[in-house]
Amino acid sequence: MKKMALMGLIFSVMASGVFGDENDGIFNYKIGQFDVYMIVESQRDGNAGILVGADDAALKKYIPANGFKHTANAFLVKTGKQNIVIDTGTGAGGIVVDKIKKLGVDPEKVDAVLITHLHGDHFGSLQKDGKAVFPKAKVYLSAKELEHFTKTSPNAGAVAALTPYSSQTVTFEPGELSAAAANKKLKEVLPGISPIAAYGHTPGHTMFLIENGKAKLLIIADLLHVALVQFPLPEISATYDMDQKAAASVRRQVLEYAAKEKIPVGGMHVVYPGVGNVTKDGNGFKFTPMK
């Protein structure tokens, strides 16, 4: 079994191709003919205090004595026909936008922005001084997420970020994880990209499955915040999770799916390279970063 798992991991890397530069905070991962870039906006010392229900023994076992890093990431997808941004970071210092430019894409050339959820470290680069940073882009997000953060429990930052895109905002109903696990065809929001519901962190928290040819990558967004602990102990949630019980449940389901189907995952709070393979490890999971 271990040999088969290893071969699956090797095949995933060989089939898709990887390379990157940690100094630049950019990691490129090939999904068939698609180029996916993980972009680091910021990295700082992590805080295990955000974990809910983690005892001292677990923290000591999984977190090094010298601590760990917390990162905030965004993604850029070049399909050959479209330039697609998945989440935009906080907007601090214009870092995400500058790195997108470095990758050869002017903000005016971004065709779509996919928002996983409406927390400030995911929509922050959408607007600057009340104007759209990506003026020609359509902004896609879950209808449930939009309803919650603009009407049910309005968030001023989210409203301000989306206002310049009032005529360019597109909502969707994400597919069910059970359908993906059953290998059913999911409804695409854009060619090669399908949204999948992962509610718990927020009411409309959404993942995106990127597919081209036989290659896949699952953008898990904020499924977890402290990878060192939450991969092996998926029942541990974070204070940021609005529904911690639901977040823990969907976390385990998603990791089971990724491990079983050998689908690499990419996360917004997974340290560089931010992309890797998930395998079963006892009652939890192991994350192996791409190299």
For each predicted feature, which ranges?
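Positively charged n-region of N-terminal signal peptides that target proteins for export
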Residues: M1-M4
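Bacterial N-terminal signal peptides
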Residues: M7-A15
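Metallo-beta-lactamase
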Residues: D21-N23, K30, V105, K109, ...
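Conserved beta-strand hairpin/beta-sheet module of binuclear metal-dependent hydrolase folds
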Residues: E22-K102, M207-L223
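Active-site environment of divalent metal-dependent phosphoester hydrolases
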Residues: D24, L118-S125, H148, S178-A179, ...
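Active-site neighborhood of phospho(di)ester-bond hydrolases with catalytic His/Asp-centered motifs
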Residues: V85-G89, D111-D121, Y140-S142, A197-G200, ...
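Active-site metal-binding motif and surrounding structural segment of the metallo-beta-lactamase
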Residues: G93-Y140
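Cap/insert and terminal regions of metallo-dependent hydrolase folds
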Residues: G213-K291
